[in-house]
Amino acid sequence: MFSDKMILIAGPCVIEEEETTLEIAAKIQEIVAPYADHIHWIFKSSYDKANRSSIHSYRGPGLKEGLRILSKVKQTFGVEILTDVHSPEEARAAAEVCDILQIPAFLCRQTDLLVAAAETQAVINIKKGQFLSPWDMQGPVDKVLSTGNSKIILTERGCSFGYNNLVSDMRAIAVLSKMGFPVVFDGTHSVQLPGGLKTHSGGQTEFIPTLTRAALAAGAHGLFIETHTNPAIAKSDAASMLSLKAFEVLLPVWNQLYQCVRSFEMASV
């Protein structure tokens, strides 16, 4: 589905203004361009963050306006688009614009949502819930496969570890890989401190380099990275997003590590 290139799902957490979204997409494209032979970039952003901690938090522009902006990103930069869907009713509309439909971690066991998304025949990225073991992901996978759609990505994003904390078990990469689909590691949501700031989630971005390197070394097929020109003023997940400046510094490291691990795996076959 993605050949041997490293999958890189990257973009801002939520769609903000159209100008901001296009600016971020342009910068990511510029950063990724030198690695086009080795990296498969997919732009991601959400039209609605339906699970914000507070009723007062910004959720996004909504389905109609959000898809319009994502369509403009797709047309302007010629990039594949990923967004998350939250109900069966949203899946068909989102699939008209987006190449990949994402099932949010909190909703990864919702049968009707999984089936509706899969029936569009889009690629389905299932994010593993913080409450699931890696082997429990076989259930969501089977629900997607029941529709005849086998275009699946599995994303590991950490497990709940007590209150307001997550931990990443790299054994999950190996377990999920045995299901036969590309496994992506979410390097930014994995450093969240869910609800840690009362009305919104905190984050420990200083651990993004460590965890992303570990995931690639463990055999992940790619990374999911939320990034922003200025995370401090981002309207969602400001505490856990990676700055574009840091993204640019880390990208060659990720690329080299991915190529090294893939070379080792090929030599071991």
Curated annotation (Swiss-Prot):
Key words, A-Z: Cytoplasm, Lipopolysaccharide biosynthesis, Transferase
Keyword Cytoplasm among UniProt keywords: yes
Primary localization class, coarse: cytoplasm
Enzyme Commission no: 2.5.1.55
A single GO cellular-component term on record: cytoplasm
Family per record: Belongs to the KdsA family.
Protein name: 2-dehydro-3-deoxyphosphooctonate aldolase
Organism: Chlamydia abortus (strain DSM 27085 / S26/3) (Chlamydophila abortus)
Lineage, highest ranks first: Bacteria, Pseudomonadati, Chlamydiota, Chlamydiia, Chlamydiales
Gene (name only): kdsA
